[in-house]
Regions:
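Active-site region of glycoside hydrolase catalytic domains
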Residues: 1-240
Length: 240
Protein backbone atom coordinates (compact mmCIF):
# COMPACT_ATOMS: atom_id res chain seq x y z
CA UNK A 1 0.00 0.00 0.00
CA UNK A 2 1.24 3.47 -0.90
CA UNK A 3 -0.12 6.60 0.76
CA UNK A 4 -0.25 10.19 -0.44
CA UNK A 5 -2.66 13.12 -0.42
CA UNK A 6 -4.16 15.44 -3.00
CA UNK A 7 -4.75 19.02 -1.85
CA UNK A 8 -6.22 21.52 -4.27
CA UNK A 9 -4.21 24.33 -5.77
CA UNK A 10 -3.49 26.43 -8.85
CA UNK A 11 -0.53 26.14 -11.15
CA UNK A 12 1.68 28.09 -13.52
CA UNK A 13 3.64 27.53 -16.71
CA UNK A 14 6.24 29.77 -18.38
CA UNK A 15 5.59 31.93 -21.42
CA UNK A 16 8.69 30.46 -23.06
CA UNK A 17 11.48 28.00 -22.35
CA UNK A 18 13.78 30.88 -21.46
CA UNK A 19 15.39 30.22 -18.07
CA UNK A 20 14.11 33.51 -16.66
CA UNK A 21 10.50 32.73 -17.62
CA UNK A 22 10.78 29.21 -16.19
CA UNK A 23 12.16 30.52 -12.89
CA UNK A 24 9.47 33.22 -12.76
CA UNK A 25 6.70 30.66 -13.24
CA UNK A 26 8.17 28.41 -10.57
CA UNK A 27 8.54 31.28 -8.09
CA UNK A 28 5.00 32.48 -8.66
CA UNK A 29 3.64 28.97 -8.13
CA UNK A 30 5.38 28.51 -4.78
CA UNK A 31 6.11 32.00 -3.42
CA UNK A 32 3.27 34.24 -4.56
CA UNK A 33 1.01 35.40 -1.73
CA UNK A 34 -0.48 38.52 -3.31
CA UNK A 35 -2.54 37.13 -6.18
CA UNK A 36 -6.21 36.77 -5.31
CA UNK A 37 -6.44 33.12 -6.26
CA UNK A 38 -5.34 29.64 -5.14
CA UNK A 39 -1.71 29.73 -6.27
CA UNK A 40 -0.41 30.10 -2.73
CA UNK A 41 -2.11 26.89 -1.64
CA UNK A 42 0.44 24.79 -3.51
CA UNK A 43 3.28 25.63 -1.11
CA UNK A 44 1.18 26.41 1.96
CA UNK A 45 -0.40 22.95 2.09
CA UNK A 46 2.41 20.85 0.63
CA UNK A 47 5.55 22.29 2.22
CA UNK A 48 4.62 21.31 5.80
CA UNK A 49 3.71 17.76 4.76
CA UNK A 50 6.64 17.02 2.45
CA UNK A 51 9.34 19.43 3.70
CA UNK A 52 8.48 19.66 7.39
CA UNK A 53 8.14 23.44 7.48
CA UNK A 54 5.80 26.20 6.38
CA UNK A 55 7.17 28.48 3.64
CA UNK A 56 8.80 31.58 5.11
CA UNK A 57 6.93 33.93 2.76
CA UNK A 58 3.63 32.83 4.26
CA UNK A 59 4.87 32.86 7.84
CA UNK A 60 6.07 36.44 7.41
CA UNK A 61 2.94 37.69 5.64
CA UNK A 62 0.50 35.97 8.01
CA UNK A 63 2.46 36.36 11.26
CA UNK A 64 -0.22 38.50 12.90
CA UNK A 65 -2.90 35.88 12.30
CA UNK A 66 -1.18 32.55 12.89
CA UNK A 67 -1.37 30.49 16.08
CA UNK A 68 1.85 29.21 17.59
CA UNK A 69 3.30 26.41 15.45
CA UNK A 70 5.26 23.99 17.64
CA UNK A 71 7.81 21.32 16.82
CA UNK A 72 5.24 18.77 17.99
CA UNK A 73 2.80 20.15 15.41
CA UNK A 74 5.36 19.76 12.65
CA UNK A 75 6.32 16.26 13.76
CA UNK A 76 2.68 15.23 13.40
CA UNK A 77 2.17 17.04 10.08
CA UNK A 78 5.43 15.93 8.46
CA UNK A 79 4.75 12.23 7.96
CA UNK A 80 6.47 10.04 5.35
CA UNK A 81 4.26 9.91 2.25
CA UNK A 82 4.89 7.94 -0.92
CA UNK A 83 3.55 10.28 -3.59
CA UNK A 84 2.02 13.64 -4.45
CA UNK A 85 -1.55 13.79 -5.74
CA UNK A 86 -2.80 16.81 -7.67
CA UNK A 87 -6.00 17.75 -9.48
CA UNK A 88 -4.71 19.72 -12.48
CA UNK A 89 -7.10 21.32 -14.97
CA UNK A 90 -5.40 24.54 -16.08
CA UNK A 91 -2.62 26.97 -15.32
CA UNK A 92 -1.60 30.61 -15.53
CA UNK A 93 1.03 31.73 -18.03
CA UNK A 94 3.88 33.63 -16.38
CA UNK A 95 6.84 35.60 -17.72
CA UNK A 96 9.85 37.21 -16.07
CA UNK A 97 9.61 40.82 -14.93
CA UNK A 98 12.56 42.89 -13.72
CA UNK A 99 10.40 44.90 -11.32
CA UNK A 100 8.19 42.26 -9.70
CA UNK A 101 10.11 39.00 -10.40
CA UNK A 102 7.16 37.58 -12.30
CA UNK A 103 4.32 38.78 -14.49
CA UNK A 104 0.97 37.11 -15.01
CA UNK A 105 0.22 37.08 -18.74
CA UNK A 106 -3.32 38.13 -19.66
CA UNK A 107 -5.35 35.71 -21.78
CA UNK A 108 -6.48 37.06 -25.12
CA UNK A 109 -10.16 37.45 -26.05
CA UNK A 110 -11.39 34.13 -27.36
CA UNK A 111 -8.85 32.06 -25.41
CA UNK A 112 -9.93 28.37 -25.53
CA UNK A 113 -12.08 27.36 -22.59
CA UNK A 114 -14.27 24.53 -21.36
CA UNK A 115 -18.02 24.50 -20.83
CA UNK A 116 -17.36 25.81 -17.32
CA UNK A 117 -15.31 28.66 -18.81
CA UNK A 118 -12.09 27.22 -17.42
CA UNK A 119 -9.09 28.03 -19.65
CA UNK A 120 -7.58 25.19 -21.68
CA UNK A 121 -3.82 25.19 -21.04
CA UNK A 122 -2.40 21.73 -21.80
CA UNK A 123 1.21 22.85 -21.18
CA UNK A 124 0.45 22.85 -17.46
CA UNK A 125 0.42 19.04 -17.42
CA UNK A 126 4.13 19.16 -18.15
CA UNK A 127 5.24 22.14 -16.10
CA UNK A 128 3.23 21.60 -12.91
CA UNK A 129 4.48 18.01 -12.37
CA UNK A 130 8.02 19.18 -13.20
CA UNK A 131 7.93 21.97 -10.62
CA UNK A 132 6.24 19.81 -7.97
CA UNK A 133 8.62 16.87 -8.35
CA UNK A 134 11.68 19.13 -8.29
CA UNK A 135 10.53 20.69 -5.02
CA UNK A 136 9.15 17.69 -3.16
CA UNK A 137 11.21 14.81 -4.61
CA UNK A 138 8.19 12.51 -4.88
CA UNK A 139 6.39 10.83 -7.79
CA UNK A 140 3.13 12.50 -8.74
CA UNK A 141 -0.29 11.18 -9.66
CA UNK A 142 -2.62 13.42 -11.66
CA UNK A 143 -5.69 12.61 -9.57
CA UNK A 144 -8.09 14.66 -11.72
CA UNK A 145 -7.97 16.11 -15.24
CA UNK A 146 -10.85 16.55 -17.64
CA UNK A 147 -13.30 18.80 -19.45
CA UNK A 148 -16.85 19.93 -18.72
CA UNK A 149 -19.12 20.02 -21.75
CA UNK A 150 -22.91 20.30 -22.36
CA UNK A 151 -23.07 16.83 -23.88
CA UNK A 152 -26.24 15.42 -25.40
CA UNK A 153 -27.32 12.27 -27.20
CA UNK A 154 -27.41 12.87 -30.97
CA UNK A 155 -29.97 11.49 -33.42
CA UNK A 156 -27.71 8.51 -34.11
CA UNK A 157 -27.72 7.60 -30.41
CA UNK A 158 -24.10 8.65 -29.87
CA UNK A 159 -22.52 11.41 -27.81
CA UNK A 160 -20.12 13.21 -30.14
CA UNK A 161 -17.83 14.92 -27.63
CA UNK A 162 -14.89 15.52 -29.96
CA UNK A 163 -14.02 18.60 -27.89
CA UNK A 164 -13.28 16.33 -24.92
CA UNK A 165 -11.16 14.02 -27.08
CA UNK A 166 -9.14 17.00 -28.31
CA UNK A 167 -8.75 18.30 -24.74
CA UNK A 168 -7.53 14.98 -23.35
CA UNK A 169 -5.24 14.37 -26.33
CA UNK A 170 -3.55 17.75 -25.88
CA UNK A 171 -3.11 17.36 -22.12
CA UNK A 172 -1.86 13.78 -22.36
CA UNK A 173 0.66 14.91 -24.98
CA UNK A 174 2.31 17.08 -22.32
CA UNK A 175 1.92 14.39 -19.67
CA UNK A 176 3.84 12.03 -21.96
CA UNK A 177 6.48 14.74 -22.52
CA UNK A 178 7.01 14.82 -18.75
CA UNK A 179 7.34 11.04 -18.68
CA UNK A 180 9.76 11.06 -21.62
CA UNK A 181 11.99 13.47 -19.67
CA UNK A 182 11.98 11.14 -16.65
CA UNK A 183 9.81 13.37 -14.52
CA UNK A 184 8.26 10.79 -12.14
CA UNK A 185 4.64 10.99 -13.27
CA UNK A 186 3.27 7.80 -11.74
CA UNK A 187 -0.31 7.81 -12.98
CA UNK A 188 -3.19 9.75 -14.54
CA UNK A 189 -6.90 9.69 -13.71
CA UNK A 190 -9.37 11.27 -16.13
CA UNK A 191 -12.21 13.20 -14.51
CA UNK A 192 -14.47 11.52 -14.73
CA UNK A 193 -15.69 8.03 -15.58
CA UNK A 194 -19.36 9.07 -15.48
CA UNK A 195 -21.31 12.30 -15.40
CA UNK A 196 -21.98 13.01 -11.74
CA UNK A 197 -22.93 15.53 -9.08
CA UNK A 198 -20.20 18.17 -9.17
CA UNK A 199 -19.66 19.54 -5.69
CA UNK A 200 -19.99 23.22 -6.66
CA UNK A 201 -22.26 22.87 -9.71
CA UNK A 202 -24.64 20.00 -9.03
CA UNK A 203 -25.83 18.22 -12.17
CA UNK A 204 -25.33 21.22 -14.47
CA UNK A 205 -21.85 20.23 -15.70
CA UNK A 206 -20.88 16.95 -17.36
CA UNK A 207 -17.29 15.71 -17.07
CA UNK A 208 -17.83 12.01 -17.76
CA UNK A 209 -16.57 9.86 -20.61
CA UNK A 210 -19.78 7.92 -19.95
CA UNK A 211 -23.09 9.78 -20.33
CA UNK A 212 -25.67 9.40 -17.55
CA UNK A 213 -29.39 10.00 -18.04
CA UNK A 214 -30.16 11.36 -14.59
CA UNK A 215 -33.84 10.39 -14.83
CA UNK A 216 -33.49 6.79 -15.99
CA UNK A 217 -29.87 6.29 -14.81
CA UNK A 218 -29.09 4.73 -18.21
CA UNK A 219 -25.41 4.92 -19.12
CA UNK A 220 -24.06 5.50 -22.64
CA UNK A 221 -20.36 5.46 -23.48
CA UNK A 222 -19.42 8.73 -25.16
CA UNK A 223 -17.12 8.88 -28.16
CA UNK A 224 -14.43 10.08 -25.75
CA UNK A 225 -14.88 6.92 -23.72
CA UNK A 226 -14.34 4.77 -26.80
CA UNK A 227 -11.28 6.84 -27.69
CA UNK A 228 -9.90 6.62 -24.14
CA UNK A 229 -10.20 2.83 -24.28
CA UNK A 230 -7.85 2.95 -27.28
CA UNK A 231 -5.47 5.21 -25.36
CA UNK A 232 -5.31 2.69 -22.53
CA UNK A 233 -5.03 -0.27 -24.91
CA UNK A 234 -2.10 1.32 -26.75
CA UNK A 235 -0.44 2.53 -23.53
CA UNK A 236 -0.73 6.06 -24.88
CA UNK A 237 0.82 5.38 -28.27
CA UNK A 238 -2.12 6.97 -30.12
CA UNK A 239 -1.61 10.31 -28.34
CA UNK A 240 -0.55 12.90 -30.91
Amino acid sequence: IKVGFAPTGAFTYPKSNDEKDVEAAKNMMFKNITQDNWVWNVAWWNDPVYLGQYPKEGLEALAAYLPEITSEDMELIHQPLDFIGMNIYNGQMVSADDQTSWKLEERYIGFPQTGMKWPITPEVLYWAPKFLCERYKKPIYITENGLASPDMIAADGKIHDENRIAFLDQYLHYYRKASDEDIPVAGYFVWSLMDNFEWAFGYTERFGIVYVDYTSQERTIKESGKWYKKVIGSNGEIIK
